[in-house]
């Protein structure tokens, strides 16, 4: 029960943060609130890929790098994303809009290559569609 409560608390903290991450002072507060050690809170925060202890962009792009996506030319999608965003994995665009991350598997093998942006799935990707997807995400977030 405490583990679920901690994960819920960490989700809430991260969602409230402008930079989409878990600041150390708030992880310490979560430890006190839940009665879980600071070390355990940090361990949970760094174990799950949906959490970050470093500032990130407004939108999180996760690209699948597992076998199905790799065999479906995911590397071309990665190259296009890096070119458009001018970032590498683990980096955030200068405008703070996007952070690019890699994922071992998104569970979307039937529509490989695949990625998620803020947990919204995108499959059957081709490099030619990446610019439009990013433009729409950025536009929709301004509404």
Summary of predicted features, one role per range:
Residues 1-143:
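Signature of N-terminal electron-transfer/Fe-S-associated modules in redox systems
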């Amino acid at each position: 029960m405490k583990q679920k409560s901690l994960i819920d608390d960490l989700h809430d903290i991260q969602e409230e943060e402008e930079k989409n991450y878990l600041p150390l002072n708030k992880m310490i507060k979560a430890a006190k609130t839940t009665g879980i050690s600071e070390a355990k809170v940090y361990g949970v925060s760094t174990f799950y890929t949906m959490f970050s202890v470093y500032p990130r962009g407004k939108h999180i792009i996760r690209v699948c790098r597992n076998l199905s996506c790799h065999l479906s030319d995911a590397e071309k999608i990665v190259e296009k994303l890096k070119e458009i965003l001018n970032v590498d994995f683990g980096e955030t665009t200068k405008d703070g809009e996007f952070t690019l991350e890699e994922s071992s598997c998104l569970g979307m093998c039937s529509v490989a290559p695949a990625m998620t942006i803020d947990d919204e799935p995108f499959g059957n990707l081709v490099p030619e569609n990446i610019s439009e997807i990013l433009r729409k995400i950025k536009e929709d977030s301004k509404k």
